[in-house]
Curated annotation (Swiss-Prot):
Upper taxonomic lineage: Eukaryota, Fungi, Dikarya, Ascomycota, Taphrinomycotina
Main location: cytoplasm
InterPro entries referenced in this protein's UniProt entry, alphabetically: ARM-like, ARM-type_fold, Npl3_RRM1, Nucleotide-bd_a/b_plait_sf, PUM-HD, Pumilio_domain_protein, Pumilio_RNA-bd_rpt, RBD_domain_sf
Pumilio repeats: from-to residues: 191-226, 227-263, 264-302, 374-410
Boundaries of every RRM domain copy: 1-74
GO molecular function, one term: mRNA 3'-UTR AU-rich region binding
Species of provenance: Schizosaccharomyces pombe (strain 972 / ATCC 24843) (Fission yeast)
Modified-residue entries (Phosphothreonine), positions: T104
Entries under Gene3D superfamilies matching the protein: 3.30.70.330, Leucine-rich Repeat Variant
Family matches, as PANTHER family: PROTEIN JSN1-RELATED (PTHR47093:SF1)
This protein's name: Pumilio domain-containing protein C56F2.08c
The keyword Acetylation appears for this protein: no
Keywords from the UniProt entry: Cytoplasm, Phosphoprotein, Repeat, RNA-binding
Length: 661
């Protein structure tokens, strides 16, 4: 029987059955809605153990944290309809101090299964590491099955308190001022032995206890420690008591004192790592050095995933690994455990803190390659997670160990039947953006991009991806779609991509003149309604001759649109359309962009792009002054700003600047 907790709100029994039936025949399922938990009963105990090992602390539900799966057994008064009495604590032996002896705990079983992998990872660090010591620490972590499920509160408050606040304040003042001798301090400490455990968590009492451990002799400190040690973990997580607990550990000097502290803290070490004050108490034990401080690293390896995903636990692990009292073997044990559990730690912000430290600040060799080897089998889950995908991307762009990048890219793009890439691209939240980020990063070799694009195209076609907001950028990058240039105004054909920037500017300017002429100059009867600037014919390559095309700006006879009797304008040079606005033309040819007045004749046998009309003017940026005289024709009048909104901005250069429009 399994007790499943931390389920998403509204989880149905059918979803639980579908999840757990993969590991054996499910007998019964009870949903405990108020607690978001469930009870799953298997026909055989072996199926329950397999399911527990496979699903415990795993994020099996989308957009939800890991679920907790524990073995349970029916209580003595269990009946099929009595759900509240159906489950008792996991099969274990409990004591009155909250310590549970569980030989089949999840941490021990996981550590036992990964024992060989941890030793192999430690060997590949290529450092002076004694693997026999690492193996002995793993065995010790598995054998020490006394694990506390909770930290019981300190001793109950005494009904009659011998020392009041004023008395405690006076004792502390006299000790600080040197008024008491060491013998007098020890006499006071002996008189307070019965209350020393309670005083350790008191606002004033904890400072007095600190003074006792600082000034008393070792026999007196051992006598006080024997009374405090059973409650040292509870004192260590108290906002006042944590200072006394840290002081007690810091001044411990004899083997007996250290052994007492280790004995009573070891079952609570994992819980201390989770606490904001307790994690500092655990770190204080590092000063005991090897082998007395080994229990800290054994607990980290046994509960690596749980501690690494907690806020204070992840930072405590990092601090312990950076401590000078940690040996290479102890560091290798914990770092190897982090690598083995990296696919779970990467989905958590606190776990990512550890992995980032491992990559950026650790001195272990081959760490990038070892991480890549482990994560290569979990790409379908890490690449579809917003946080974990950043770790994969960091490994791909690693320059220290190129093997890690090649391994991840191979498993990402060339998996069997494209299963990994298909799973990633089907995840619309993270997958497509992650793949686009990978193939567009400069460090990816261009020699591989063509193959990557082919694989991505094939997968996108197989999953019937549409060019929507999710897949648009990726499809454009691999060449499945092209950016279409739509005209900004109706009736104006978009210029071809082969037209240079000057031709595109000419098209915009002429189009704006044609469409805005009615509002600027009034209704003109002779103005044609055809597009002012037709697009370049795509079937005619540049540099070749073509037949005259009616209405095409690129090649048209000069005399096609010239009306008889129309005043002739000097067009020896191409006229700036801004200046041509004020020319004396009749309605039949006034500002008609199709007119030959604004075209240059094309020599036979050669097709050229239109030159953008220009004029050179010396501008005088003085209010009310003339804005320059054109040098092309003396017949053309002067031009003032404001005539054409589209061209008005170009008539305001900086003072003394030569402007070429």
């Amino acid at each position: 029987m399994l007790y499943v907790s931390n389920l998403p709100v509204g989880t149905s029994s059918s979803a639980i059955h579908a999840l757990f039936s993969a590991y054996g025949n499910v007998k019964d399922i009870w949903m405990l809605s108020p607690d978001n938990s469930a009870i799953v009963s298997y026909e055989s105990l072996s199926s329950a153990i397999v399911a527990r090992d496979a699903l415990h602390n795993r994020p099996v539900f989308e957009n939800h944290g890991p679920v907790q799966v524990m073995l349970a057994k029916p209580s003595s008064n269990y009946e099929p309809g009595n759900i509240t009495a159906a489950v008792s604590p996991p099969a274990s032996t409990s004591s009155k101090d909250g310590v549970v002896c569980s030989p089949t705990s999840t941490g021990a079983s996981q550590l036992l299964k990964s024992r060989v992998d941890i030793l192999e990872v430690a060997r590949q660090f290529e450092m002076r590491i004694n693997l026999d010591i690492v193996d002995s620490m793993i065995a010790s972590a598995i054998e020490n099955n006394k694990v506390a499920t909770e930290i019981l509160p300190p001793v109950e408050t005494l009904r009659s308190r011998q020392f009041e606040a004023s008395k405690l304040r006076e004792i502390r003042k006299n000790i600080d001022s040197g008024f008491y001798t060491q013998e007098e301090i020890e006499v006071i400490a002996r008189s307070m032995l019965d209350d020393v455990a309670e005083l350790s968590s008191d606002y004033l009492g904890n400072t007095v206890v600190q003074k006792f451990f600082e000034y008393c002799s070792d026999p007196i400190k051992e006598a006080m420690l024997e009374r405090i040690a059973p409650y040292l973990a509870a004192i260590g997580i108290h906002k006042n008591g944590t200072w006394a607990a840290q002081k007690i550990i810091d001044v411990a000097s004899t083997e007996k004192q250290m052994d007492l502290i280790v004995k009573h803290l070891r079952p609570y070490t994992a819980l201390l790592y989770f606490d904001q004050f307790g994690n500092y108490v655990a770190q204080c034990c590092l000063r005991f050095k090897y082998p007395k401080n080994t229990f800290l690293f054994e607990v980290m390896a046994r509960h690596c995933c749980e501690i690494g995903q907690s806020r204070f636990g992840a930072r405590a692990i990092r601090a312990c690994l950076e401590n000078e009292n940690a040996t290479f073997e102890q560091q290798a044990l914990v770092v190897a455990s982090i690598i083995i559990n990296s696919h779970l730690l990467a989905t958590n912000s606190n776990g990512m803190l550890l992995l980032t430290w491992l990559l950026d600040n650790s001195f272990f060799r081959n760490r990038h390659r070892l991480l890549a080897i482990h994560l290569a089998t979990h790409l379908h889950t890490t690449c579809t997670h917003k946080l974990a995908s950043t770790l994969i991307f960091k490994l791909i762009n690693n320059k220290q160990e190129p093997e890690s990048r090649n391994l991840l890219l191979k498993n990402l793009f060339f998996s069997e039947k494209d299963n990994v890439l298909t799973y990633i691209l089907q995840d619309q939240a993270v997958g497509p953006s992650f793949i686009h980020k990978v193939i567009t990063y400069p460090s990816i070799g261009r020699e591989f991009l063509a193959q990557f694009h082919l694989v991505i195209k094939r997968v996108l076609i197989n999953i019937h991806a549409q060019p929507n907001a999710v897949y648009c950028r990726l499809m454009e990058e691999v060449g499945m779609t092209s950016k279409s240039i739509s005209p900004s105004l109706s009736g104006i054909s978009a210029p071809s991509a082969s037209v240079d920037s000057s031709a595109s500017r000419l098209a915009r300017d002429f189009g704006s003149l044609s469409l805005s002429s009615n509002s600027l100059l009034g209704s003109l009867g002779g103005l044609e309604s055809t597009p002012a600037y037709p697009s370049y014919p795509s079937h005619i390559p540049l540099g070749t001759a073509s037949l005259p095309l009616k209405g095409n700006l690129y090649q048209i006879s000069r005399s096609d649109d010239i009306k008889s009797g129309a005043p002739v304008l000097d067009t020896s040079s191409l006229v700036n359309p801004t200046l041509a606005k004020s020319a004396s033309l009749n309605n039949s040819s006034l500002l008609n962009p199709s007119s030959s007045l604004l075209r240059r004749e094309v020599p036979a046998g050669k097709l050229t792009m239109p030159a953008y009309p220009y004029t050179t003017q010396l501008m005088n940026h003085t209010a009310g002054a003339d804005y320059g005289l054109p040098r092309l024709s003396s017949k053309l009048p002067q031009v003032f700003p404001g005539n054409y909104p589209r061209l008005q901005q170009s008539l305001f250069p900086r003072q003394g600047e030569l402007r070429f429009n």
